[in-house]
């Protein structure tokens, strides 16, 4: 189940999804409020579809609310391996109250708790800082809980932590700049006007000539960025000046600065694989829309690759759920 970027939905549907994979009567989620009326427990009510099929759940920082109920419940019941990165941490139950003048008020009435008893809420709105911003639950208050069958350790106050963390590769500064300036978007639009059709979403790939066209397209475009090395060099200069060493190393500093100065065109080739992948996804969207973009992105997806690897490795998969994998 790919729940990355899934911001949630209906509580009942999250219970129904979990019910596909666990025995009837299995606890799925509970809610607890300041008044007893909001204390409820939800269990799997129907006969499951399959309680044995190996199951992997993909999550990230955009997985929230109902999607965290699904992933957290299946993790707590030792039914699925969770992969990706820490989820959003939205564990609040909210109720909408009508007000005058056709307006409404959304009121938090309870919190969600997964079967182990942990609350997935990450921000503590009852203790805000002086700027009125909610703080994360401090490490000192994070509590350990245990899964139902294997007695594995899971923790509250931080969303859902994956069993296998797959770190996201950060974009290069040049790619970030091109995104912020909508230059991928602009070229993809021009590409769509020039070519009536392309191959299927999973097979589409820019030719070297087409990538050269993109490089030429950027020649007169305004985009600026600094590299991480250049940022560190600026910090080094400040530190050296503060410590009164800069005059002694100024010649060496200037030589290093000249060596590290980025070259836009050179970086377009240095980070070609990354830039080409982003551009191809943008172009595919013009022809095959959102479903096509998803299909194309899965061709180079480290989280999906790790999930497939885990599902194929029965020993690894079972050891994770049994809590014996170290």
Task: Please annotate each region the language model reported.
Residues 66, 78-79, 83-85, 89-152, ...:
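Polar, glycine-rich mid-to-C-terminal structural blocks
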Residues 9-62, 92-98, 113:
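Gly/Ser/Thr-rich loop/hinge elements
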Residues 2, 28-30, 54-59, 81-84, ...:
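Structural recognition of the beta-strand scaffold that forms the well-ordered cores
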Residues 1, 21, 55, 74, ...:
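Terminal peptide-recognition signature
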Residues 22-32, 65-66, 75-84:
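Bacterial peptidoglycan biogenesis and beta-lactam-recognition machinery
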Residues 11, 15, 64-71, 106, ...:
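Amphipathic alpha-helical transducer elements in NTP-driven molecular machines
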Residues 119-326:
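Conserved functional hotspot residues or short segments at active or partner-binding sites
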Residues 1-9:
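Short, glycine-/small-residue-enriched flexible loop/hinge segments at domain edges that mediate gating
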